[in-house]
A protein has these predicted regions:
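C-terminal hydrophobic helical "lid"/dimerization subdomain
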Residues: 1, 213, 261, 265-317
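Short N-terminal strand-loop motif that marks the start
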Residues: 1-58, 315-317
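Mid-domain Rossmann-like dinucleotide-binding core that forms the NAD(H)/NADP(H) cofactor-binding site
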Residues: 111-186
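Glycine-rich phosphate-binding loop and adjacent beta-alpha segment
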Residues: 210-272, 276-278, 314-317
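A structural motif shared across PLP-dependent enzymes of the aminotransferase-like
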Residues: 86-99
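Glycine-rich beta-strand-centered segment in the early N-terminal region that forms part
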Residues: 21-35, 48-88, 105
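Short amphipathic alpha-helix with an adjacent loop that forms part of the alpha/beta core around
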Residues: 187-197
Length: 317
């Protein structure tokens, strides 16, 4: 039997017929309900001439319904709604390992679960070291930045300064709990420091050189910079002022995670926090039908105002 799959070509995404995958004894076959678009997927799309020959089936922020389980799988059963670590998931069905899924509480709509993306933020937040009363700045208020901001507020940050050049992102940051929000092109670091002083924790969530520089300006002595942004431009090369990092005696922490067991644990924690109402993704999500995948990627490439996270939904809206 075949299924619909989004395949990346030189001209963009095409919906093609491909075989429904066959699982082994330790895997699950899952009917896709929704899958988010990651900035990593967008990077591949924008540079597709370099990727289509070897990496043309994407999607790893998926949620769905378990259809079939391997003979060794006992933790979930057909009919369970899960969020998963899996690739590729821009398709009617995807396969995940039994260790790579988390069952969703009934109160969480799978369209907004985004378990893998939320897990990345939760893992980073577990390394913030936020204490009640800490003053925190977030540089970059896209989807990841604003989930991290909500997590820092839950952890007890007493004052949060959001920084982003896009007005819709600044407005959303304050809607979700930031105390103040600045455009870094209009309000320079000196002015922010004069108004609020230095920050105990600064989260870099933009993935660009200027964000690293701004974090260096804002962080206090013996403070922490947490790198959450995914640095892809210029082959990921960045420069830092090591003399200033040395003098300030700061901790610089890579917030990323690659170990599956740690990411699944963070995904489980994230779904619990979402269930309890401590974080929300819904205001950040724009839903597209699956066959609108090319439209979604073009909107993201254009930087459509108010578009934080595109989610492909398999059933028609």
């Amino acid at each position: 039997m075949n299924m619909k799959t989004a395949v990346l070509t030189l001209t963009g995404f095409e919906i093609q017929e491909t075989p429904i995958p066959i699982i082994n004894d330790n895997e699950l076959l899952i009917k896709t309900l929704a899958c988010g678009v990651c900035s990593g997927d967008l990077f591949v799309y924008q540079n597709r001439a370099d990727f289509v020959a070897t990496y043309n089936r994407l999607g790893h922020e998926a949620s769905g319904e378990v259809i079939e389980v391997g003979r060794n799988v006992t933790a979930v059963k057909p009919g369970d709604i899960i969020t998963a670590l899996a690739l590729p998931a821009y398709a009617d069905y995807f396969v995940a390992s039994a260790e790579g899924v988390v069952k969703l509480p009934q109160v969480i709509n799978p369209t907004y679960a985004l378990g893998e993306a939320v897990a990345c933020c939760v893992h980073a937040a577990n390394r913030f070291g936020t204490k009640p009363g800490d003053k925190l700045a977030i540089v970059g208020c896209g989807f990841m930045g604003l989930i991290c901001m909500q997590l820092a507020k839950y952890q007890g940050a007493s004052f949060i300064c959001a920084i982003d050049p896009v007005v819709e992102r600044r407005e959303m940051s304050q809607r979700l709990g930031a105390d103040v929000a600045y455009n870094p092109f209009e309000t320079k670091s000196d002015a922010i420091l004069a108004e609020h002083g230095e920050f105990d924790i600064v989260i870099e969530a933009a993935g660009v050189q200027s964000a690293v520089d701004l974090c260096t300006d804002l962080v206090a002595q013996h403070g922490r910079i947490i790198l959450v942004g995914y640095h892809q431009s210029n082959n990921g090369l960045r420069t830092v002022n090591m003399e200033r990092w040395n003098f300030k005696a700061i901790d610089v922490i890579n917030g990323h995670v690659r170990r599956q067991n740690e990411k699944v644990a963070a995904m489980r924690q994230g779904m619990m926090l979402m269930q309890q109402g401590h974080i929300t993704t819904e205001p950040l999500v724009t839903v597209y039908d699956f066959d609108e995948i090319e439209h979604a990627f073009r909107d993201l490439t254009r930087g459509t105002p108010g578009l934080f996270k595109a989610v492909l939904q398999m059933e028609k809206k």
